[in-house]
Amino acid sequence: MPDQFDVAIIGTGAGGGTLAWHLARAGKRILILERGPFLPREKLNWDTSAVFLDNRYHTKEIWQDREGKELHPQQSYFVGGQTKVYGAAMFRMRAEDFGVIQHQAGISPAWPISYADMEPYYTRAEELFHVHGDLGAAPSIPGGFGSSFDPTEPFHSKRYPYPALANEPRMQSIENDVRKLGVNTFPIPLGLKRNEEDPLASKCVRCDTCDGYPCLVHAKSDADINCIRQIMHLPNVTLMTNSRATRLLTNSTGTAVTAVEVIHSGPGKPYGSALQPADTSAPPASSNGNPAIYTAGFFAVCAGAVNSAVLLLASANEKHPTGLANRSDQVGRNFMYHQADALLAISTSRNEDSYTKTWGTNDFYLKDPDPSYPFPLGQVQPVGSFHFEMMKGDAPPLTPGFVLEAMKHHAVPWWLTTEDLPDPDNRITLHNTTPLWVESWQSGLVGAHPAGDTGRTNQSEPVTDAAPGRIQLSYTPNNIESFNRLKDRWVDVLKKAGHATTSVPLHAYFKKRIPLEGVGHQNGTCRMGADPATSVLDPHCKAHDLDNLYVVDASCFVSASAVNPSLTIIANAMRVADHLLADRLK
């Protein structure tokens, strides 16, 4: 029986969406499976209480932490994945990040590819995701352009496709004053559809509801808007929403994946549900009926570092008793997501800026200024905006609202990131107990989508969906001393510049502290490498153990770096797509 599709892609986030966009435009027959619907376009997209206190766009799935306590992940299951609610900061990893780096807490290992291998794809990713940035009056250097702002910026073969966003008054004042102290600052590269020269013609309105919010006006460059909606109408593309992949099925020898098992939820009949693969018996019935089976020549798992590992572990069979691609026992291990926290810098000066995420510094990225501590610290950037409702969840119970409101008008929120290091004991495991039944979103039609169809995007009725067994996320923080030094360094800079009378960690008032629940930067659970004994994937992101299985999301990361991972995920998906088209899908 011929395969139904050339490639089946599981997940529509930064990796899956980009891979689908690239392969579909090359004319390949693509099946795209997304476990969630299209995110509803509604007023609540920009409602701070709904987004941050009610967790309207997070799954109701319950995971476990290392001790078995309940964990409520800030995970979004929609077309576009986590990019629907990300902050759109589009950083290239530093060239040094691809090599071995000694940290105070240990080694950040080398990748099997170099920055030079990735650079052309970074350039293409910046074009696809409409990235604004500025290298300044940088001289030409080998390979292209350097940066006159950021000494750590690697070479670019081309300048940014769109100009950087300008500062508003408060952020301009702070930037001027920290520069007087000798701090190098740079414009943050942002994936936003902003027209600074003609704001009236701009999709992006520089609102104060960007970081962590869905974009009501679709001005944020995400994998849904920039990728999936550009290809879903093509005759060679089948997009199925509300369709959760539960298992990958292999041939009798276990050398290749033959099919994906899918549970559809919601109205409508899923396309191809009666088909069965050649080398497997019918799967067991589920609570929603028999799972659908889809065959393809190649399979790309792009469900995010947690769920990609979960799918491989859940696909264990006689030939792969510990999970697919897990001969090395590395699937699920080396989970990373950054040591990161938000810091409120409070001063007597008022902050009336709407959007503050316009500049940052990497002066502490590669080294601490203290010569007795010759280790990297990390990156500093502002948060896009801050609302006092974000503090209401855990503020002291008698704190008056006007106090929180006053803090909002005198605070600038900063986001500090230090690399966390791969640790095999920081891992995802799947306990094959009775699945935990949860309430999750139901909006949109099941099955193939015609041109322009995004389902009933204003419906928001919860339905019952099952988590795939019990997911356990075991994590012990590392590199903490470097992170604490980074916070101290930045607070000291702000105080010397006159822009921080005091400071408080935002998690002191945030309903959910960033550790563990905040899995937006998840990576590393299916690391790539040349040695099958110590890695899951080869340098092209193909599983060492199976000939036609790829994992194309942040799971493949060997190290986390200290920058937002989105652009690297996108660029790597383009790199893998080129490999597939040149070498495998002829």
Show which residues each predicted segment covers.
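N-terminal glycine-rich phosphate/pyrophosphate-binding loop and immediately adjacent elements
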Residues: 1-124, 243, 262-264, 307, ...
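A glycine-rich dinucleotide-binding beta-alpha-beta segment and adjacent secondary-structure elements
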Residues: 188, 206-210, 246-249, 415, ...
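Glycine-rich loop(s) and the adjacent beta-strand/alpha-helix scaffold that form part
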Residues: 22-25, 36-41, 46, 234, ...
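Conserved redox-cofactor binding core of oxidoreductases
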Residues: 102-245, 518
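Short hydrophobic beta-strand that contains or immediately precedes a catalytic carboxylate
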Residues: 32-33, 239-240, 551-552
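Glycine- and acidic
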Residues: 104-107, 155-161, 209-215, 295, ...
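A conserved FAD-binding loop/helix module that cradles the flavin
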Residues: 559-577
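FAD cofactor-binding and catalytic pocket of flavoenzymes
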Residues: 67-74, 86, 111-112, 269-270, ...
